[in-house]
Amino acid sequence: MNSHPYLDPEPELPFSSGAGDALSATSTSASQPFRGWNRGRILGQKRALKPREVWAIRVRLHIARKLRDLALFNLAIDSKLRGCELRIVDIIQGGAIRTRTGVIQQKTGAKVQFEITEQSREAVKTWVAKANLGRDDWLFPSRNGREKHLTTRQYARLVGEWIEGIGLPVKEYGTHSMRRTKASLIYRKTGNLRAVQLLLGHT
């Protein structure tokens, strides 16, 4: 059987993200087997995207003119954060898109610094102009009103669409894949585990 073009083996980061593998379901009795909540689900670490998969998603979003999604995807890779929680002021200063910035993680309260690549800056510039966003707006506002940002549930759905769009199994990838992708690429290029740990906020 031919292997899927996107599913050839890849090295994993040599440390855990903290999520364990699913435990097998057990039975409470011979007549009434217990069905675990996680039966049939793939749990644990989500896979990082490979360079060609990142490229494939970018190309599809560009061709489809999905300006918001392209900016959101690029920033998710760069920042290793949920891009839906970014504000204009986090990214733009004095009318120019920053090359490097830092934001406070809502979940942990820790400050995360990251570089914004040229292709991300171009995507953000195009999206901000198209959406006519102001300094105090969310970078990716909810369609229900600019006072709210795109929800994490909506973001997860979009990630699923991007993954499915290039033929990858959605169950093996998720929003955490965005976080792990840049770290995985840096580790494969440098082999510097400590740098990757710091990049992901591990002390």
Which residue stretches match the model-derived regions?
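Conserved catalytic core of the tyrosine transesterase superfamily
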Residues: 1-203
